[in-house]
């Protein structure tokens, strides 16, 4: 009788990377790590550039060469470009271009991140075990796991979010995103913090200006990037704020380490 396949969901964030490290440390079975990459358009990643580079240049080679496991990167058929330029087909805004995603309603997650994961999961054997990066100090999220087909190694070995941060740091596998934000997400996320947005405005202005170009297109229904501001308004406010002493907050994990 062969054992089931063991797969780790991996965003490249501290909890999912710590899960990979724990599996190696404790000789837990692990065959593959899976990352679903949202794309801005066909050629540009939706990941913050530094995080995208971390995935491709550090984490993927580490998994394949050091851990000896497959690292699979999934992509949806749709990109954020497709989501933004979707033409509304019914209702009072029929015929208008949808525009930016709404804060709190993650159409990007629905259309660009989840579909390839579902397609991948459909090809797996029913007895496949999935490792998920949920820390011991996240009881509400842990309560949703069955502990059989979906397992948290962080909880099994008593690791909190701070512990996960430290473990990644010790192994040189902490994503650089934690220097300016507390989580990893798309660089055009409507729920992004000011520090995340400022990072894109100042470090990757050409990319952020793509959003401003879209904002100025004709027949756009939703022009706001965040709950209150368009991309051009976000840029103007943050640049003005940075000139008067804006500082990026330290990660709560860094402060507790």
Model-predicted regions and their roles:
Residues 1-257:
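Nucleotide-activated chemistry modules centered on ATP-dependent adenylation/adenylyltransferase
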């Amino acid at each position: 009788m062969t054992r089931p396949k063991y797969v780790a969901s991996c965003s490249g964030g501290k909890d999912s990377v710590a899960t990979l490290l724990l599996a190696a440390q404790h000789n837990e079975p692990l065959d593959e790590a899976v990352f679903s990459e949202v794309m801005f358009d066909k050629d540009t990643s939706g990941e913050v550039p530094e995080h995208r580079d971390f995935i491709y240049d550090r984490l993927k080679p580490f998994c394949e060469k050091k851990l000896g496991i497959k690292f699979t990167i999934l992509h949806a058929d749709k990109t954020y470009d497709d989501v933004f330029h979707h033409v509304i087909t019914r209702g009072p805004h029929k015929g208008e271009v949808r525009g930016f995603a709404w804060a709190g309603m993650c159409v990007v997650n629905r259309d660009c991140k989840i579909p390839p994961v579902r397609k991948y999961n459909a090809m797996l054997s029913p007895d496949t075990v999935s490792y998920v990066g949920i820390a011991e100090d996240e009881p509400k999220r842990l309560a949703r796991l069955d502990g059989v087909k979906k397992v948290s190694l962080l909880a099994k070995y008593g690791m909190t979010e701070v512990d996960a941060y430290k473990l990644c740091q010790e192994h040189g596998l902490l994503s650089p995103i934690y220097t300016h934000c507390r989580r990893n997400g798309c660089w055009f996320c409507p729920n992004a913090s000011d520090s995340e947005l400022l990072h894109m405005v100042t470090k990757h202005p050409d990319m952020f200006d793509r959003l401003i170009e879209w904002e100025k297109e004709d027949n756009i229904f939703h022009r706001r990037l965040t709950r209150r501001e368009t991309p051009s308004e976000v840029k103007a406010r943050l640049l003005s704020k940075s000139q008067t002493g804006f500082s990026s907050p330290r990660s709560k994990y860094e402060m507790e380490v």
